[in-house]
Amino acid sequence: VPGCNPLASPGTGLPGCVQQAITDAPLTSAKIDFVAPSFEWPESEVLNLTYTRDLSDTLQLEATYLWSKQEEALYKIVDGSPLVGDQPQVPTLTAPDGRPIYNQTGYRTYKAGLYNDCCGTREVFSLALSKSFNDGDGKFTVSYTNQNIDELSGMTSSTSNSNFGKTGAIDYNNRKAMRSIYETEHRLLAALSSTHYFLGEDSPTTFTLVFERKSGLPGYVTFDTFERTVGDYQSEAFGYDHNLNDDSSALLYIPTGVNDPIICWSRNCGDEGSPAAIARAEEVINLLHNVYGLSEYAGSIQPRGSFNYPWQSSLDFKITQVLPGFRADDEVIITLGIENLLNLID
């Protein structure tokens, strides 16, 4: 506001001109985060079962099963369309693949509310077998863990726009439970530790090796919806504001083949059937169907976790040396660790 000094009369609250400017500010040109009136603290149901048994004096078995169902807190955008209660509705305008197209018409002026939605589920099973030796100074453990986790959203950020759009979806406002981006379906672990007393009984030296072999994280393919021009939101970014479309995580429609009727292989469908368009189509179909293995989703929108990244292996080594301190009860602990010895071999 011209002539308004927000620092006038420090310690006495906001000057009147500042308060008036806030009152007069048009909400349509502001980014707004709010908590929906219907929001309640999310609830979870959890079942945890653990079984342990000593198979001998030196051999232990442990099995664990964890199941949970969790309501999630997630953001939904309000684009100016009528609400039912406090809930935004699904737009009637749809893309050729069936997903809704929203009608946001601002630039970095989205309105996002925090709502409840249900539900994600999680199943985790683990089995571990441990063998001690050398009078307890050595231990060998092998374990296997399996995860089956579905969630609505990964909630990957501290800001509403990133939480809204960073985790892949068909319709961000009406998410369906899909495979978690954090799921490790299979994990094998072997750990060997051995303690020795080269420097005396009060100065143990422990050597530890940990080998891990695990399946790759879930992956999925998305559209590039990065769009700054408001007039192109609906045609290029499913109607989302630039602050939301820049995450480009709209799950990709998988074409049936080079002749899929809802796909254009040239700009604005202006050069279909040309050698360049045909070559482009064949390259994309080969990538999606053969490289990523998504042919089973042809003619539909592939879900999150439609493929897995490669398995990973690691071998970590650590030496821990305990030394006496300056006082009777003091200890000095020195640790040397090498993360993934396999990198030194390969």
Task: Indicate where each model-derived feature is located.
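Gram-negative outer-membrane beta-barrel transporters
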Residues: 62-221, 291
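Substrate-binding/catalytic groove segments of enzymes
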Residues: 198-201, 323-331, 342-346
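Hydrophobic, lipid-facing positions within transmembrane beta-strands of outer-membrane proteins
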Residues: 35, 45-49, 123-127, 186-192, ...
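Surface-exposed cleft-lining segments at the edges of enzyme active sites
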Residues: 34, 175-176, 301-306
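Solvent-exposed loop/turn elements at secondary-structure boundaries
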Residues: 1-113, 118, 234-238, 242-249, ...
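Gly/Thr-rich phosphate-binding loop signature of adenosyl cofactor/nucleotide-binding cores
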Residues: 338-340
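Extracytoplasmic gating/loop element in the C-terminal half of outer-membrane beta-barrel translocons
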Residues: 20, 206-326, 333
